[in-house]
Regions:
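Non-catalytic, surface beta->alpha helical segment in thiol-disulfide oxidoreductase systems
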Residues: 68-91
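A generic structural signal for alpha->beta connector loops
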Residues: 9-11, 36-40
Length: 93
């Protein structure tokens, strides 16, 4: 049941850009994971800001879970899943 308060809601920030095949794969992975884990997916186009382009331009896609980097480049579904599982276990303890 999805009933966490907003304070406990996990936020995945997904840094991406148009025309990025790795980003498309990563987004599919995140949407698949969202079926099993309750999180908000915040998608940010790095081209919306020179600062973001400079920071993440060579790394994208970049995935952060609650502000902590969980992966970049080729996003590993199992790594992200494990981090989400750890967070879920921590919230339920």
């Amino acid at each position: 049941m999805k009933g966490n308060s907003m304070m406990e809601q996990t936020i995945i920030t997904f840094y991406t850009r148009k025309g990025c095949p790795l980003c498309d794969k990563a987004k599919s992975t995140l949407l698949e994971l969202n079926k099993d884990y309750d999180f908000i997916l915040e998608e940010i186009d790095i081209e919306s800001s020179d600062e973001l382009t400079e920071q993440y331009g060579l790394m994208i896609p970049v995935v952060q879970i609650d502000g902590v980097e969980a992966g970049f480049g080729v996003i590993n579904k199992f790594d992200v899943s494990n981090r989400l599982q750890e967070k879920k276990a921590h919230l339920n303890s």
